[in-house]
């Protein structure tokens, strides 16, 4: 695979290999055949970051080869959304012959949505001033004249200039209902929107008919908690990153959801609060004892659940676990399978043409 060529003819074989690999990894815990969710074979990534290489009068996007660390020029990127590809061409054309925008520019980040909105961040090794803002506004207006719905941001050390706004609003069709998700620049969002829809619909399917309340750790911008709210009486979700919490609060209002509460704290802190080890001011006004948590949802970082959180989640009748690293999922299952059994298993091909797998398991108490 090269950045400008995807081996689409190999997609089926690569996906089949992942299914076999996941089944083998899960064999100690389950004999289930994974439910498999395919990715689009191209234009599936909604965000991308490129270094910018200055070559005489020329200027272009590059990435570095992971093995050799050599530079690879990238003029098109079929893994990324069609909007990112349009913007890559338009940004280079707009910046190449503009000394103010070009000088000391070292990276461009792209974030797009299925609703065809974009935020483009230009990263600099220099101070950004009013002259930069004027030139950037002219570029933004020129891009919009090409029917590109784009917002520009300039970044430098301790500086962030958002010309209009630093977010875009995604609209996803999820099980017959449109969900609105605010996505903030430089915050985590799901990279593969088509796969995200399938993950949300699978999570809805495995929790349909649920009783009681849902607890979610690591909720980000509320991606899962808001979609799942329709299956539960109430949802309580935790997140540590301030921009994500603010986006989640916006998303609750935008989707007219009245049974979700987001609190800003780490999963480890919430574990302490639930166990009565510590009291937190951030939990004032929230009566944890009034919740009837029957299901806990976790979507941890690649490192998986720490041992304290492992113990905590074992207290719940049902555990819904989305994993971006099946190796740490299996490590967690060594503990979780002592008290719970695997009821559902899914493979989400979030990252086609790579070794990486995303998977989901529903665990129920034995």
Curated annotation (Swiss-Prot):
Record-level GO cellular component terms: cytosol
Known catalytic reactions: uridine(54) in tRNA + S-adenosyl-L-methionine = 5-methyluridine(54) in tRNA + S-adenosyl-L-homocysteine + H(+); uridine(341) in tmRNA + S-adenosyl-L-methionine = 5-methyluridine(341) in tmRNA + S-adenosyl-L-homocysteine + H(+)
Cross-referenced NCBIfam families: trmA_only (TIGR02143)
Protein name, per record: tRNA/tmRNA (uracil-C(5))-methyltransferase
Similarity field: Belongs to the class I-like SAM-binding methyltransferase superfamily. RNA M5U methyltransferase family. TrmA subfamily.
Gene3D superfamilies, sorted: 2.40.50.1070, Vaccinia Virus protein VP39
Domain of life: Bacteria
UniProt-listed GO biological process terms: tRNA methylation
Molecular function as annotated in GO: rRNA binding; tRNA (uracil(54)-C5)-methyltransferase activity, S-adenosyl methionine-dependent; tRNA binding
Job of this protein: Dual-specificity methyltransferase that catalyzes the formation of 5-methyluridine at position 54 (m5U54) in all tRNAs, and that of position 341 (m5U341) in tmRNA (transfer-mRNA).
InterPro entries hit by this protein: MeTrfase_TrmA_AS, MeTrfase_TrmA_CS, SAM-dependent_MTases_sf, TrmA_MeTrfase, U5_MeTrfase_fam
Protein's organism: Shigella flexneri
Record key words, sorted: Methyltransferase, S-adenosyl-L-methionine, Transferase, tRNA processing
Gene this chain is encoded by: trmA
Residues at the catalytic site: 324, 358
EC number: 2.1.1.-, 2.1.1.35
Binding-site list for S-adenosyl-L-methionine: 190, 218, 223, 239, 299
């Amino acid at each position: 695979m090269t950045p400008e060529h995807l081996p689409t003819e190999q997609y089926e074989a690569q996906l089949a290999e992942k299914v076999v690999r996941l089944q083998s990894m899960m064999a100690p815990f389950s004999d289930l055949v994974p439910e498999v969710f395919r990715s689009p074979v191209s234009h599936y990534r909604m965000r991308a970051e490129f270094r910018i290489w200055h070559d005489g009068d020329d200027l272009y996007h590059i990435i570095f080869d992971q093995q050799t660390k050599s530079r690879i020029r990238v003029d098109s990127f079929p893994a990324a959304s069609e909007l990112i590809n349009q913007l890559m061409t338009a940004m280079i054309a707009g910046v190449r012959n503009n000394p103010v925008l070009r000088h000391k520019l070292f990276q461009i980040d792209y974030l797009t949505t299925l609703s065809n909105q974009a935020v483009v961040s230009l990263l600099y090794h220099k101070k950004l001033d009013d002259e930069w803002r004027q030139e950037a506004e002219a570029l933004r207006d020129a891009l919009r004249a090409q029917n590109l719905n784009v917002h520009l941001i300039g970044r430098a050390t301790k500086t962030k200039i958002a010309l209009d706004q630093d977010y875009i609003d995604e609209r996803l069709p999820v099980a017959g209902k449109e969900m609105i998700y605010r996505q903030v620049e430089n915050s985590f969002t799901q990279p593969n929107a088509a796969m995200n829809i399938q993950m949300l619909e699978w999570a809805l399917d495995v929790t349909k008919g649920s009783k009681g309340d849902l607890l979610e750790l690591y909720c980000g911008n509320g991606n899962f908690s808001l979609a799942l709210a329709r299956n539960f009486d109430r949802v309580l979700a935790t997140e540590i990153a301030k921009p994500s919490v603010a986006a989640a609060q916006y998303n609750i209002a935008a989707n007219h959801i009245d049974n979700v509460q987001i609190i800003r704290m780490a999963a480890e802190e919430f574990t302490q609060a639930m166990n009565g080890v510590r009291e937190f001011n951030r939990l004032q006004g929230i009566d944890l004892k009034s919740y009837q948590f029957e299901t806990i949802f976790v979507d941890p970082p690649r490192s998986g659940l720490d041992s304290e959180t492992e113990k905590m989640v074992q207290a719940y009748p049902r555990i819904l676990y989305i994993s971006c690293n099946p190796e740490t999922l299996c490590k967690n299952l060594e503990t979780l399978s002592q008290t719970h059994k695997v009821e559902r298993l899914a493979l989400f091909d979030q990252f086609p043409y790579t070794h990486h797998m995303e998977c989901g398991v529903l665990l129920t108490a034995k």
